[in-house]
């Protein structure tokens, strides 16, 4: 249920992910809402609830005080998507700085299961609540063929980590497809 006259914020790591992944989903969820392309906001005409959609990409060459979220006053909820892509808690701290008003502001952080999740440690340290949910746990909404296709197309370790939520510490090669005989050029 949307709170009237509130503003919420959705953050992801890149504009490309916002355009190709989140935007089509939000378009489905927010039928009847109006979209402002220059501000990247969705507004509910009934409650006047606004959802700001931002990508948080700050190259290491920019100073940490530069804040892509600057100026927003969020009074509803803040969602950070793809938390595993952020190497430090910077984006979470900046998002918390935007949650300034309203009744019980809420920060929700979502990401893939990887070993040494900085963002999950941040939640634990703040006595927050962590929910471990996998695609497998959501199987009533996914077809059997979806799981079969995932098993056929993903490497076994990736299937275990991303679908079954059983990540393993990294070992050996970063990319399992790497073949030293094919991919290394010697002088």
Question: PLM ranges: what are they?
Answer:
Residues 138-187:
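ATPase catalytic-site recognition across NTP-hydrolyzing enzymes
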Residues 4-6, 76, 105:
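Nucleotide donor/acceptor-binding cores
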Residues 16-76, 167:
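Inter-Walker segment of RecA-like/P-loop motor cores
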Residues 9, 54, 79, 108, ...:
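Hydrophobic/aromatic beta-strand patches that form the interior of the parallel beta-sheet core
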Residues 85-155:
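ASCE P-loop NTPase helicase motor core
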Residues 5-18:
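Conserved RecA-like ASCE P-loop NTPase motor core of nucleic-acid helicases/translocases
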Residues 81-83:
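Walker B catalytic acidic pair
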């Amino acid at each position: 249920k949307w709170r009237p006259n509130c503003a919420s914020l959705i953050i992801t790591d890149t504009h490309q992910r916002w355009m190709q992944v989140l935007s089509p989903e939000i378009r489905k969820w927010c039928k009847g809402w109006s979209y402002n392309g220059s501000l990247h906001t969705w507004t509910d005409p009934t409650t006047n609830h606004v959802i700001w959609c931002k990508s948080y990409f700050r190259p290491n060459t920019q100073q940490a005080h530069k804040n892509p979220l600057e100026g927003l006053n969020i009074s509803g909820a803040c969602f950070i998507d793809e938390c595993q892509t952020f190497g430090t808690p910077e984006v979470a701290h900046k998002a918390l700085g935007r949650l300034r008003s309203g009744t019980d502001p809420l920060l929700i952080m979502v990401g893939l299961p990887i070993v040494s999740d900085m963002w999950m440690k941040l939640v634990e340290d703040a006595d927050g609540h962590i929910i471990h949910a996998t695609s497998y746990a959501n199987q009533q909404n996914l077809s059997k063929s979806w799981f079969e296709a995932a098993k056929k197309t993903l490497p076994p370790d990736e299937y275990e980590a991303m679908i079954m939520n059983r990540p393993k510490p990294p070992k050996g090669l970063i990319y399992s497809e790497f073949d030293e005989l094919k991919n290394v050029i010697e002088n």
